[in-house]
Amino acid sequence: MGTGGRRGTRSGKGTEGAAATSSSCLYRCIECNREAQELYRDYSHGVLKITICKSCQKPVDKYIEYDPVIILINAILCKTQAYRHILFNTKINIHGKLCMFCLLCEAYLRWWQLQDSSQSPAPDDVIRYAKEWDFYRMFVIASFEQAAFLTGIFAFLWVQQPMTAKRAPDFVLLLKALLLSSYGKLLLIPAVIWEHDYTPLCLRLIKVFVLTSNFQAVRVTLNTNRRLSLLVVLSGLLLESIVVFFFQRMEWDVSSDCALYKSQDF
């Protein structure tokens, strides 16, 4: 999730160029969330001056001078300022790739748990084909559960928005924020590779971390309070749990490998 230096910012040549920034290209102050026309001004010969927010009188985005590692650490700590920098003041187009990789990680975890709990006397070719098919199946199930989680969030916001008389949230930005904030699922692979007695606990902690990151992404994107953000995430988790229950029943009816869901953490 980290971004580096001045990546994703725009500035004109000199003071006049910076002042002529289009009003449609707005940034956000990472401290007070007010809109800003620019992040810094490039006067000449690389002399830069960070723009001061007119509302809070603090730098609009101090992270444009920070190292990507520092930004990533602050994002891991779920700092609001780091999330605003990443979501509003940078241009990151890895949402789809990151989502796909996270789904592969989750599918691998489920596939690994399934293979670890099942033994078959069938020939090697049959076992190899069955294992490959199981991985594809786990990927599809993980995709459905992820889609259910996102659908639950969007459905709750769609129902709740008319009640609050607020403007409709930017669902595209929220989708990108949720996909980016799910980067914690990448930790599933190290947890499986370096297996030990505390692996089940690690998997649960990863799940909690991902949900916490989703909560912070919702809170920053919608600029709302903690209570509503928590309800939004819980709505997505509820619909995801319903889909998990559906797959449990389906697996129980059509095959005998439903023990996978009993032993897995997600």
Swiss-Prot record:
Transmembrane regions listed in the UniProt entry: 139-159, 173-193, 228-248
A GO CC term attached to the entry: endoplasmic reticulum membrane
Signal peptide stretch: none
Localization per record: Endoplasmic reticulum membrane
Inactivation phenotype: Mice show an increase in the abundance of type 1 oxidative muscle fibers in the diaphragm. Female mice show also an increase in the abundance of type 1 muscle fibers in the extensor digitorum longus. Conditional knockout in neurons leads to decreased body mass; male show reduced white adipose tissue mass while female show reduced perigonadal fat mass. Show also abnormal circling behavior and severe seizures.
Tissue expression profile of the protein: Ubiquitous. Highly expressed in lung.
Principal cellular location given in the protein's record: endoplasmic reticulum
Keyword Transferase among record annotations: no
Keywords: Cholesterol metabolism, Endoplasmic reticulum, Lipid metabolism, Lipid transport, Membrane, Steroid metabolism, Sterol metabolism, Transmembrane, Transmembrane helix, Transport
Domain of life the protein comes from: Eukaryota
GO terms classed as biological process: bile acid metabolic process; cholesterol metabolic process; cholesterol transport; intracellular sterol transport; regulation of cholesterol metabolic process; regulation of intracellular cholesterol transport
Bilayer topology annotation: Multi-pass membrane protein
Family: Belongs to the ARV1 family.
Its job: Plays a role as a mediator in the endoplasmic reticulum (ER) cholesterol and bile acid homeostasis. Participates in sterol transport out of the ER and distribution into plasma membranes.
Name of this protein: Protein ARV1
Gene of this entry: Arv1
